[in-house]
């Protein structure tokens, strides 16, 4: 009882350190993309998905001809050593990394409702270390080709697309919440810069989605 009655000693610095510690922690959370500071609002939890700026390879339109927004959610990022079309194209072993994303299109229910599709983005991590070091959450909504142009001066100059029908693997089925073996539209994307191969992508798109628009005959792909 006597010990409980004794006053607790608090030094002058102890009243300041927690504040500094909290501020540093908040700064770290902002840097990690976990929280966002907005003027007039305060600090809020960052959205788990973000809208993709100016999609190029897969665009969908509503009934009025407006481009539907695409939201991206990065699911994983890892080194890729297995064989595939990216291997011969990029020639980047053992530095090939793949970022796996789920892409969400939001539509009114009367137009079919929301739908998802799946993406693998392959690149040479030795050339583009920023995609390896930033948090996965920070990559949500990022236009990778624009980031490559802005930070590394590598502008997209040519794109080749290959389309086929492909059965959903267990991984793809889990990401899209569909049955394994479901027939999907597979889109393989080979992207080039002035210096050669830039990146390779795989898209898996449910067959019931609306018409896909792929426009690669643009005057300035760097603006995309």
Regions found by a protein language model. Name each.
Residues 39, 49, 78-81:
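A generic structural motif
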Residues 1-45:
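N-terminal helix-turn-helix
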Residues 67-68:
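Long, compositionally biased intrinsically disordered regions
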Residues 39, 47, 165-167:
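A general secondary-structure junction signal
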Residues 71-224:
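C-terminal all-alpha effector/ligand-binding and dimerization domain
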Residues 18, 48, 188-189:
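Fold-independent oxyanion-binding glycine-rich loops
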Residues 58-64:
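Short aromatic-glycine motifs in intrinsically disordered, low-complexity regions
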